[in-house]
Each structure stands twice: as structure tokens, then as C-alpha cells.
């Protein structure tokens, strides 16, 4: 089956055909690192991680070059530095490390390349100089501006006109502009701004605009035309529209051949955002839930659809994963099976149809249970192989059944192991009262003991 993805620019699904099947390029806008990421911020890395896994299955792991940037200079970062008294680099390094650890806990594979904006200021200046020479940009009193009217087809990605811009979309009002829709390529430094937010340039000291950062990083690491550019739907306009304007006017080549955008997460019927104050951070969620539960929950809705984030969604995701891991446990020792071409890949090849892929994963778990009921060794081995292959595509089932059932607290697990062994010893000694006491005590802690031919094991319930 061919891979079909919804291209925002074309407003329809298109068959994906890379420029070079041996080097498939993917660029996704990464975090602005000044605070903890909320769970809505985690949707793009999870969605595009699934896309990356599908691409790896089709073209090979080494063929996929995936860049996800770090925005480490921006107005909110500067404000955080001024408020805290910490250097900008201390803030950005701290929160970039936390972000990467958080998304790693969601089974997101690290990007091939993680460019930081501040490491690419010379490349940004080079693009701006080219835009000025080609009359697409001009120097004003407060900065260097891109002239939106100079690009006749500006707005083709989003289908929006410059005057359609809405509040909060990061297009600043400034009397220095020739046109209200013009946007900043370079911002001149203001009195009192921290020195670590200022660079020299041919036009004066200052810092780059937000949009030019991605244009420079994508071109340097992936080339002037990339296969797929992704991000949240809120970036479609103006950020991605402005990236197109800068890059294509500077280089005279198409920036991206396919554009993909994921939908919002809602909480209480409103878009989740820091400005609305209705956010829950990934960092906090990971204290209460396994990362795989968060990932599963994020995949329950199609990536372009809005997803209502609730406690019930997390509970349902945990229950479903418990059942799937339970099936995997029953066939875990059955090695040597062959994974067949299941419906998981077919679902994902149709514009990342994760709801259908998860339904197929559940069906594979039922097959594995049936094979275990029948004690069919070949079917059990194949069931194990099918589950693990499907899990690899989705970024799920990355733990052993025992690890999943017992959690990750090693010290606590050792204590429970000792209690279970004490119960085994009590049963051998026919001290039934002690054995029953231990079982009840563990049950009160949410631990279930399972006795079988191979001995006694336990799981959290």
C-alpha cells in the first residue's frame, strides 16, 4: 500500500513520494524552552514520531533524516531571564533537557538533528541579506522587515490573507512597518535588554525574528527543499506562512513538498494553552502515569482532530494497555514467531490513522489470547511477533509484561518481590495463615499475586 498523507497546502490527501528514497527529510518545529511543556506541546513530537516510524518501515531507519529544532531565543525567554535573573542559556539548557527527558518518556525517538536557534545566527543573517538585495525586505528604525506585499502568493499555505491575522498569532503592531502585515526578520536591541540576547549584524545590534530561525536551520541541515514540514495547526499562520515567504523568496525554491499539521488538545472545552492557564504539564503527568499511557491517549484521536484531554481518557488508555500487555504476557515465552503484514501499518499508511491502528492492536491481543487458550505454540509465537511488530510502529509495548505490570520503582519492586517470596516460603512450610496474611496485605497495596505452574508472580492492579 502507498503512504498517503494530508497535505495542508493541497487541502487533500496525497501519495507521499520523497525526492530521494535514500534520504527522506522531515522538519518539525520544536519547543520554545522557557518553561515546562504541557501535554498539548507533546502532541507534535508523538504524532511525528509515529510518522517517522512509518517512514523507517518503508525506507529504512538510516534513510530518515529528522530535524526538530530548539527555539532558545525569543521574547518569552528574555522575559523569563529578566524575571529570574538567570542567564538565558541557563534557562534554555534546563528546560530543553527537561523537554527531551519528558518526550523520551513518551517513547519518542530522539531526532537525527536537534539544531538550536542561537547556533545559526550567521545563517539567518545571510538569508536576510539576500532578501534585502532581492527587494523582499527593508531596514527600518526598529528592525529589518519582510515586505509581505512583495510576495504575490503569500498566504497560499493557510488560505488566509495577511489582514486575517488574529490576536496572539505573533504578528506585532509596529509603526515602523510599511505594511501592517510585514513581519520582523531582525529586531534591533532595546535599552535594558540583556547582553546575551543581542548579536552584531550589518544593520545594527539585535536578535533574529522568530520565523527566520526555522528557515535557516531547515536549509542548513536538510537542504533548501525538504520532503515534509510539520508542526501544530496553530503554526500554519503566520509562522509557516512566513517561513515559506522567507525561504522561497531567498532561495527561489520550494521550501517543503508536503505540509502536515496536528490539531489542538482541549481541556474543559477550550484549547489548552499557557496563556489561558488551563494546562497540565507532561512533567507532572509523568509522576502519576506511565509515559506509555500518555502516548496511547494522544494516539486515540486522529492527529488532525481535536482531542479532549480528561482523566477518563487516561484511565481508559491505562485499562486498554493493561489488557494488551496481559495478552503479551501469555505468549511472552513463545519465541521464533513471524510477524505478518497486519492492519496496523495499513491504517498508519492512510494519513496516520492511529485510531484504526490501535483497534487493530487490540484485535491482535485478542488473537494472542485465543492462541494461549488453545495452547497453540506456533500461533502463540506468531501472536507475540505480531504484537511486538505493531507496537514498534506505534511506539508502544516497549516494556516486558513484567516491567509493565510491576512499574518502574526498583526499590519498591524489590520489597514486593521479598514479600512474595516470603509467602512462597510460608506455603512450603504449610503456614497458611501467614501466606494469607501476606496476600491480603499486598492486595491492600494494590498488588495482586498470581500463582501458576511456573511459580508465583505479581502485578499492580
Swiss-Prot record:
ATP binds at residue 274. It is found in: Cytoplasm. SMART domains: DALR_2 (SM00840). Binds 1 zinc ion per subunit. A motif ('HIGH' region) lies at residues 31-41. It holds the Pfam family CysS_C. It comes from the Bacteria. InterPro entries: Cys-tRNA-ligase (IPR015803), Cys-tRNA-synt_Ia_DALR (IPR015273), Cys-tRNA/MSH_ligase (IPR024909), CysS_C (IPR056411), Rossmann-like_a/b/a_fold (IPR014729), tRNA-synt_1_cat_dom (IPR032678), tRNAsynth_Ia_anticodon-bd (IPR009080). Its cofactor is Zn(2+). GO terms for molecular function: ATP binding; cysteine-tRNA ligase activity; zinc ion binding. Zn(2+) binds at residues 29, 214, 239, 243. GO terms for cellular component: cytosol. It catalyses: tRNA(Cys) + L-cysteine + ATP = L-cysteinyl-tRNA(Cys) + AMP + diphosphate. GO terms for biological process: cysteinyl-tRNA aminoacylation. It is an enzyme of class 6 (ligase). A motif ('KMSKS' region) lies at residues 271-275. Keywords: Aminoacyl-tRNA synthetase, ATP-binding, Cytoplasm, Ligase, Metal-binding, Nucleotide-binding, Protein biosynthesis, Zinc. Its main location: cytoplasm. Its EC number is 6.1.1.16. Signal peptide: none annotated. The keyword Zinc applies. Belongs to the class-I aminoacyl-tRNA synthetase family. PANTHER family: CYSTEINE--TRNA LIGASE, CYTOPLASMIC, CYSTEINYL-TRNA SYNTHETASE. Monomer. This is Cysteine--tRNA ligase.
Amino acid at each position: 500500500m502507498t503512504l498517503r498523507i494530508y497535505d495542508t497546502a493541497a487541502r487533500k490527501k496525497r501519495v507521499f513520494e520523497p525526492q530521494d528514497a535514500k534520504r527522506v527529510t522531515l522538519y518539525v518545529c520544536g519547543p520554545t524552552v522557557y518553561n515546562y511543556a504541557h501535554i498539548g506541546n507533546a502532541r507534535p513530537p508523538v504524532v511525528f514520531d509515529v510518522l517517522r516510524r512509518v517512514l523507517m518501515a518503508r525506507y529504512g531507519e538510516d534513510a530518515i533524516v529528522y530535524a526538530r529544532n530548539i527555539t532558545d531565543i525569543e521574547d518569552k525567554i528574555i522575559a523569563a531571564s529578566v524575571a529570574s535573573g538567570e542567564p538565558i542559556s541557563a534557562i534554555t539548557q534546563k528546560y530543553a533537557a527537561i523537554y527531551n527527558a519528558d518526550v523520551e518518556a513518551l517513547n519518542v525517538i530522539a531526532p537525527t538533528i536537534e539544531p538550536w536557534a542561537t547556533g545559526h545566527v550567521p545563517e539567518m543573517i545571510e538569508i536576510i541579506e539576500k532578501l534585502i538585495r532581492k527587494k523582499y525586505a527593508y531596514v527600518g528604525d526598529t528592525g529589518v522587515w519582510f515586505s509581505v506585499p512583495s510576495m504575490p502568493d503569500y498566504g497560499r499555505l493557510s488560505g488566509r490573507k495577511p489582514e486575517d491575522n488574529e490576536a496572539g498569532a505573533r504578528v506585532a503592531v509596529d509603526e515602523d512597518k510599511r505594511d501592517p502585515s510585514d513581519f520582523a526578520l531582525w529586531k534591533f536591541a532595546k535599552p535594558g535588554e540583556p547582553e546575551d540576547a543581542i548579536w552584531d549584524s550589518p544593520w545594527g545590534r539585535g536578535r533574529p525574528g522568530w520565523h527566520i530561525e526555522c528557515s535557516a536551520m531547515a536549509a542548513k541541515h536538510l537542504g533548501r527543499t525538504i520532503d515534509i514540514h510539520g508542526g501544530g495547526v496553530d503554526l500554519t499562520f503566520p509562522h509557516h506562512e512566513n517561513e515559506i515567504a522567507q525561504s522561497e523568496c531567498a532561495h527561489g525554491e520550494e521550501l517543503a513538498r508536503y505540509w502536515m499539521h496536528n490539531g489542538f488538545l482541549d481541556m474543559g472545552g477550550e484549547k489548552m494553552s499557557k496563556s489561558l492557564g488551563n494546562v497540565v504539564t507532561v512533567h507532572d503527568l509523568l509522576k502519576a502515569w506511565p509515559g506509555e499511557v500518555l502516548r496511547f491517549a494522544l494516539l486515540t484521536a486522529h492527529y488532525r482532530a481535536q482531542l479532549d484531554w480528561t482523566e477518563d481518557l487516561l484511565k481508559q488508555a491505562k485499562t486498554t494497555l493493561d489488557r494488551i500487555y496481559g495478552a503479551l504476557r501469555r505468549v511472552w515465552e513463545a519465541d521464533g514467531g513471524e510477524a505478518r503484514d497486519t492492519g496496523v501499518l495499513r491504517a498508519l499508511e492512510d494519513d496516520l490513522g492511529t485510531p484504526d491502528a490501535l483497534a487493530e492492536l487490540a484485535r491482535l491481543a485478542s488473537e494472542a489470547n485465543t492462541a494461549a487458550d488453545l495452547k497453540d505454540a506456533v500461533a502463540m509465537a506468531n501472536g507475540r511477533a505480531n504484537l511486538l511488530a505493531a507496537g514498534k510502529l506505534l511506539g508502544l509495548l516497549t516494556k516486558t509484561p513484567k516491567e509493565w505490570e510491576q512499574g518502574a520503582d526498583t526499590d519498591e519492586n524489590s520489597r514486593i518481590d521479598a514479600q512474595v517470596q516470603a509467602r512462597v516460603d510460608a506455603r512450603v512450610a504449610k503456614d497458611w495463615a501467614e501466606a494469607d496474611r501476606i496476600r491480603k496485605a499486598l492486595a491492600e497495596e494494590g498488588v495482586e499475586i498470581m500463582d501458576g505452574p511456573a511459580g508465583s508472580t505479581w502485578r499492580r492492579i
